[in-house]
Amino acid sequence: MERGQVSKLGQFLPLDNYKPISAADIPDASLDMATIYIGFHHCPLPQLPAFIDSIHRTLRPGGTLIVRDHDVRSPEMATFVSLVHTVFNLGLGATWEVDAGDFKGFRPIKEWADMLTAHGFTPVGKALFQPNDPSDNALIRLIKN
C-alpha cells in the first residue's frame, strides 16, 4: 500500500462522557462493527448499562463488537495500569487534578465479557493478548445476538 491511499471513512462523533449513543447520531441496526479500545473502564458505573445498550442498538443482528481493555485480575495490576494511565495523562499535559478525577474501573476481561453477554452479546473465540505487554491488554470479539 502506498502512502496516501487510505482515505477517511465515516464521521467522528465525540464520546460525550459515555452518554448513550442517540438514534439521531447512529440509527438502529446500521453498523456492522463497533470498537471500544481501552475505554469501558473509564465509563462511570451508573452510565455503563445504558451506554452498552446503545452500542447494541446500533449494531445489525450478527454485528461485531471488538473490545480491548486491561485484564486486571489483582490489586497489583490495578495499581500498575493506574500508574500507566497517570503517566500517559501527564504526557498529554493533563494536570494532577484532571488525572485524579479520571475514573478507572478496572476489572478482569472475563467480567467485561460477562457484562456484555448480559446486554445481548455473545463472545466469539478466546481473548488475544499482545506479547510482552505488561499491562495485559486483552482483545475480545463479541457478536450481537
Tell where the protein language model's regions lie, with residue ranges:
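Class I SAM-dependent methyltransferase SAM/SAH-binding core
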Residues: 1-23
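Short loop/turn motifs at secondary-structure junctions
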Residues: 8, 30, 61, 120-123
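A short SAM/SAH-binding and catalytic strip from SAM-dependent methyltransferases
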Residues: 31-47
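A short acidic, Gly/Pro-enriched loop at the edge of an enzyme's catalytic core
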Residues: 22-34
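C-terminal lobe and adjacent flexible extensions of AdoMet/dcAdoMet transferase-like proteins
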Residues: 138-145
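C-terminal alpha-helical "lid/dimerization" subdomain adjacent to the S-adenosyl-L-methionine
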Residues: 68-131
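A short glycine-rich, Lys/Arg-flanked "PGG" loop and its adjoining helix->strand segment in the class I
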Residues: 49-61
